[in-house]
Swiss-Prot record:
Cell compartments where the protein resides: Mitochondrion; Mitochondrion matrix
Modifications after synthesis and translation: A disulfide bond locks the enzyme in the closed conformation preventing substrate entry into the catalytic chamber.
One matching Pfam family: Peptidase_M16
Tissue: Widely expressed. Expressed at higher level in muscle and heart compared to brain, pancreas, liver, lung and placenta.
Keyword line: Acetylation, Disease variant, Disulfide bond, Hydrolase, Metal-binding, Metalloprotease, Mitochondrion, Neurodegeneration, Protease, Transit peptide, Zinc
Residues covered by region (Disordered): 804-834
Disease: Spinocerebellar ataxia, autosomal recessive, 30: A form of spinocerebellar ataxia, a clinically and genetically heterogeneous group of cerebellar disorders due to degeneration of the cerebellum with variable involvement of the brainstem and spinal cord. SCAR30 is a progressive disease characterized by childhood-onset global developmental delay with variably impaired intellectual development, motor dysfunction, and cerebellar ataxia. Affected individuals may also have psychiatric abnormalities.
Impact after mutating residue 107 to Q: Loss of metalloendopeptidase activity. Loss of activity towards an amyloid-beta peptide derivative
Result after altering residue 557 to E: Decreased metalloendopeptidase activity without effect on protein stability
General function of this protein: Metalloendopeptidase of the mitochondrial matrix that functions in peptide cleavage and degradation rather than in protein processing. Has an ATP-independent activity. Specifically cleaves peptides in the range of 5 to 65 residues. Shows a preference for cleavage after small polar residues and before basic residues, but without any positional preference. Degrades the transit peptides of mitochondrial proteins after their cleavage. Also degrades other unstructured peptides.
Any Gene Ontology biological process: proteolysis
Activity control: Mainly exists in a closed and catalytically competent conformation but a closed-to-open switch allows substrate entry into the catalytic chamber. Substrate binding induces closure and dimerization. A disulfide bond may lock the enzyme in a closed conformation preventing substrate entry into the catalytic chamber, participating in redox regulation of the enzyme. Inhibited by metal-chelating agents. Inhibited by nickel and zinc excess, and slightly activated by manganese.
Protein name (database record): Presequence protease, mitochondrial
Length: 1037
């Protein structure tokens, strides 16, 4: 996977927070792993390594142990923490000097087989032989990273063995280079009369990556700002340069870069360090001697005067104003990222300058009305040896470029003169405190990503983690010098000659020109071929296709057994209490480390149909327009000072036992430090009772930003949009899902953003509020520590008593609704007093008839996103478990080969969603009709039963790695709260998964997937297609 450096440019605040994944077993009452690690001493010799440093980092609840390998100089960092989700990564400094994508293609190819594991594609095969919680690889601008995580010690050793052998002893076969990188091959490999074309997984991945205008801008920004060395090229590969790479160059790059002396090893979690060191030394490092790698990235020579560049990109078919598609940014080179305190300071300074409606650049640029959103890579970017800061606007008219530049200069001058309000600095430091306390499930992955760039350039990763020290030093600097931050702005922005102004405008013929350049390159390559070369290409194509089609013997790979899977799920204890009369509140006591997580779910059943499309917009702006006596700026300030965020999002929740029944509503989510709980609940009270819908100008700004973000997200999420549309007509919930989250919503937001008079839309918001922001049809959930619960119950009760209730009961808009009690989650009524359980009010459509719809969304992309959906059965039906295993089996044993290896798409597969929709999909795919045919062949393959018990067991392991993914303390009990799933229901489903057999898989593949057995929906996002255009059964949009 390629990481465009600029796209990862998040400040320290976001890089350590870790998202909303799941976690399973946290034991914060014990710090055994940390205490064990503190027993190591400086100079200790362990399995060929020497301990260099042992440091406690209490703010992150971990102990850091730094080591060096004696014979090779390989560096090692172990972060001991009482977290069962253990992670390993190995990182190499990879510094390409051209845009052939050599580090990226190498990252793909090393995972295709190694000396100890010579079978083809051990990486993808291990996905099905492991209970890993994460497995992947990333190519950044100047390093390549190979991480995995798992909760199982035996699994950790298995995966470590595969990763070590892959990275240090790969086969690097020529056919694997052809498949993963690029090749010349006949359009139909078995027919030498068909034309020769470029193929390859990375080739197509990068063609897809550069359909994204933000990516194009980010890449050029880095290339132009840092032009002297490796940052001047595209590490992932420019599709027009990739065909210049040879197999010999690939092998040479591995020999010079993938050596222990150029490696950094990282482990995290509660598994013992000694076992890791022993295995790494014995299986890999003992076979090498130290070398001096010549991979150091030199400092960029500073400029003596600013520079300007103009570039072009493809048109945005979702632009709210076709005459406003220009992007401009001004960027400044900053100091070396290994100066950790300066990097920390500039990261915070960046947030003060650009984050939220109170920031100077938001006021000057976003609220100017000149553009739709900040330019890509806005803020601090610390992923290159020297960091950079960038700010600008996208969605502007070309004539406004100079205006934006002068606004940026003027804003810098104003900040130098006036500085920042104390409250904004406090809000920022409060945010860091929250993110140090918030426990994510993928914390090891967050940490390895956070330290990767600094460590890559020989900075001290442990110093980077000591956020407490840096915060204290930051406060001290501010105290000693109130103009500390203003002086930094003056030094790095006002007086900095290393300043780049980059502008990008659309060219209607951009993709056409790219295609012409590719065609010219192809023509040159083909014309240079001798008859012998052509014959060899044809034979190699047949050989590759033959190899891809052969059954693979993966017996050399280590594997867990189904018996290694835990037979039962851990019990989650919940209390449900009726509060303020009849509102159920679910309390889940968890080790949340002084944090409180509050959520509320409010039904949309009484909302008139014509208002439903506007619910996502309502949710997006609800916490951003002001409330009570607070205007939107004051509200933003209070939210940052008192909470870790407050948000609302529309949800369509399937019923667990009926396909035509669902729940519709809005989920309100928030988190805070326990000391701020009354303030957070008071903010919710004001938002519910007195939201402000009068700020027309700010509403316009928010609408434009939302529309721009949706349009920008299509290239990365095209397969999801295709799948949502394909499932639209299969269930009643599918249509609502399309309205809330599909291409319909993208297009609606585009239309709203284009409106000259936005008042009619603004007037809809109070109407939605009447149906949504009250105590009718609401339920709440709280996750906090047991000690916090009494205070929490009082604050939640005060909030619920403060919000309005309808004077008379509103009737649901849909005539058929059913009240469904949610079963208690921990057996019987032990934790749920009689009459206190959650009642879900579901919408039922008894007369619904699914029907087939085929949609082709025309997009100016050179690749496609394909989705086919099939209606099957709900969660509690025993067949649901069999279909879940079947989807994994079809992906691993058939679709991966057909769609990725043979077809050249970046990704593809099958999945069964909780709502009973079975989806076949592809991602960044050069094909359409051929992919749909592959979906059909996959069904035929499943019905033929050509899979073994070993295949079924591997599919079960893969499914259970998802089912048993870790759940964070903040998210425990959410399945029960949102979906009504009790522990007993989940255990029953677990037993159904264990019981899936060959016969059951054959039965469900025939019963649901065969032609004419169930209703199918199809959708494609991509360029024009003559075959589809001629087929009247397709709707083209």
């Amino acid at each position: 996977m390629w990481r465009c450096g600029g796209r990862q440019g998040l400040c320290v605040l976001r890089r350590l927070s870790g998202g909303h994944a799941h976690h399973r077993a946290w034991r914060w009452n014990s710090n055994r792993a940390c205490e064990r690690a503190l027993q190591y001493k400086l100079g200790d010799k362990i399995h060929g390594f020497t301990v260099n440093q042992v440091t406690s980092v209490p703010e992150l609840f971990l102990t850091a142990v730094k080591l060096t390998h004696d014979d090779t100089g390989a560096r090692y960092l172990h972060l001991a923490r009482e977290d069962t989700n253990n992670l390993f990564s190995v990182q190499f400094r990879t510094t390409p000097m051209d845009s052939t994508g050599v580090p990226h293609i190498l990252e793909h190819t090393v995972l295709c087989g190694s000396q100890k594991y010579p079978c083809r594609d051990p990486f993808f095969k291990m996905l099905n032989r492991s209970l890993s919680t994460f497995m992947n690889a990333f190519t950044a601008s100047d390093y390549t990273l190979y991480p995995f995580s798992t909760q199982n010690p035996k699994d950790f050793q298995n995966l470590l063995s595969v990763y070590l052998d892959a990275t240090f002893f790969p086969c690097l076969r020529e056919l694997d280079f052809w498949q993963e990188g690029w090749r010349l091959e006949h359009e139909n490999p078995s027919d030498p009369q068909t034309p020769l074309v470029f193929k390859g997984v990375v080739f197509n991945e990068m063609k897809g990556a550069f359909t994204d205008n933000e990516r194009i801008f980010s890449q050029h920004l880095q290339n132009r700002l840092l032009p002297d060395h490796t940052y001047s090229v595209v590490s992932g590969g420019d599709p027009l340069c990739i065909p210049e790479l040879t197999w010999e160059q690939l092998k040479q790059f591995h020999a010079t870069h993938y050596h222990p002396s150029n490696a950094r090893f990282f482990t995290y979690g509660n598994f013992p360090l000694e076992q890791h060191l022993k295995q790494i030394h014995e299986e890999a490092l003992s076979k090498f001697q130290k070398i001096e790698p010549s991979t150091v990235v030199p400092a960029q020579t500073p400029w003596d005067k600013p520079r300007e560049f103009q570039i072009t990109c493809g048109p945005d078919s979702f632009a709210t104003d076709p005459s406003k598609q220009t992007t401009i940014s001004v960027s400044f080179l900053l100091p070396d990222i290994t100066d950790t305190f300066e990097a920390f300071t500039l990261s915070l300074l960046s947030s003060l300058l650009t984050s939220g409606p109170n920031s100077p650049f938001y006021k000057a640029l976003i609220e100017s009305g000149l553009g739709t959103d900040f330019s890509p890579d806005v803020g601090y970017n610390g992923y290159t040896r020297e960091a950079y800061f960038s700010v600008g606007l996208q969605g502007i008219a070309e004539k406004d470029i100079e205006t934006v530049r002068s606004l940026i200069d003027r804003t810098i001058d104003e900040v130098v003169e006036k500085g920042f309000e104390d409250d904004r600095i406090e809000a920022l430091l409060h945010k860091i405190e929250i993110q140090m306390k918030h426990q994510s499930t993928s914390f090891g992955l967050m940490l390895t990503s956070y330290i990767a760039s600094c460590w890559n350039h020989d900075g001290d990763p442990v110093e980077l983690l000591k956020l407490g020290n840096q915060l204290a030093k930051f406060r001290q600097c501010l105290q000693e010098n109130p103009k500390f931050l203003q002086e930094k702005v003056k030094q790095y922005f006002k007086n900095n000659q290393h300043k780049l102004t980059l502008s990008m405008r659309p060219d209607d013929k951009y993709h056409e020109k790219q295609a012409q350049v590719e065609a010219t390159k192809l023509k040159q390559k083909v014309e240079a071929l001798s008859p012998g070369d052509r014959q060899q290409i044809y034979e190699k194509g047949l050989e590759l296709r033959s190899q891809q089609s052969k059954p693979q013997d993966a017996s050399c790979l280590p594997a867990l057994k189904v018996s290694d899977i835990e037979p039962t799920i851990p019990v989650t204890e919940l209390d449900v209490v009726l509060t303020a009369g009849d509102i159920p509140v679910q309390y889940c006591a968890q080790p949340t480390n002084g944090m409180v997580y509050f959520r509320a779910f409010s039904s949309l059943n009484t909302l008139p149909e014509e208002l439903r499309p506007y619910v996502p917009l309502f949710c997006s702006v609800l916490t951003k327009l002001g409330c009570g006596l607070l205007d939107y700026r004051e509200q933003a300030q209070q939210i940052e000072l008192k909470t870790g965020g407050m948000s609302a999002s529309p949800h369509v929740l399937p019923d667990d036992s009926h396909m035509d029944t669902y729940e519709q509503g809005v989920l309100f989510s928030s988190l805070c430090l326990d000391r701020n709980l009354p303030d957070m609940m008071q903010l919710w009270s004001e938002i519910f009772n007195n939201p402000c819908f009068e700020e027309e100008e700010h509403f316009k700004v928010l609408v434009k930003m939302t529309a721009q973000e949706l349009a920008n997200g299509i290239p990365d999420s095209g397969h999801l949009y295709a799948s949502i549309r394909a499932g639209r007509t299969l269930t009643p919930a599918g249509d609502l899902q399309e309205t809330f989250s599909g291409m319909d919503q993208v297009r609606l937001m585009k239309r709203i953003a284009e409106m000259t008079d936005i008042k009619p839309i603004l007037r809809k918001l109070p109407r939605i509020k009447k149906h949504l922001l009250n105590g009718d049809n609401m339920r709440c959930s709280v996750n906090a520590t047991p000690q916090q619960m009494p205070q929490t119950e009082k604050a939640v009760e005060d909030f619920l008593r403060s919000i309005g209730r309808s004077k008379k009961e509103r009737r649901p808009v849909r005539p058929h609704t059913v009240e469904k009690p949610v079963p208690s989650s921990s057996g019987g009524d032990a934790h749920v007093p009689h009459g206190s359980q959650v009642i879900r009010k579901l919408v039922m459509e008894p007369t619904f008839k699914p029907w087939q719809m085929k949609t082709h969304f025309l997009m100016p992309f050179p690749v496609n996103y394909v989705g086919e959906c099939i209606r099957t059965v709900p969660y509690t039906d025993p067949d649901h478990a069999s279909l879940k295993i079947l989807a994994r089996l079809m992906t691993a044993k058939f679709l991966h080969t057909e769609i990725r290896e043979k077809g050249g798409a970046y990704g593809g597969g099958a999945k069964l969603s909780h709502n009973g929709i079975f989806t076949l999909y592809s991602y960044r795919d050069p094909n359409t009709i051929e992919t749909l045919q592959s979906f059909g062949k996959a069904v035929d393959w499943a019905k033929s039963g050509k899979f073994t018990q070993q295949d079924i067991d591997e599919a079960k392991l893969s499914v259970f790695s998802t089912v048993d993914a870790p759940v964070a303390p903040s998210d425990k009990g959410m399945d029960h709260f949102l979906y009504g799933l009790s522990d007993e229901m989940k255990q029953a489903h677990r037993e159904q998964l264990f019981a899936v057999s060959h016969d059951k898989l054959l039965a469900v593949s025939d019963r649901y997937l065969g032609t004419g057995k169930s209703t199918h929906g199809l959708a494609i996002l991509g360029p024009e297609n003559p075959k589809i255009a001629k087929d009247p059964s397709w709707i083209i949009q």
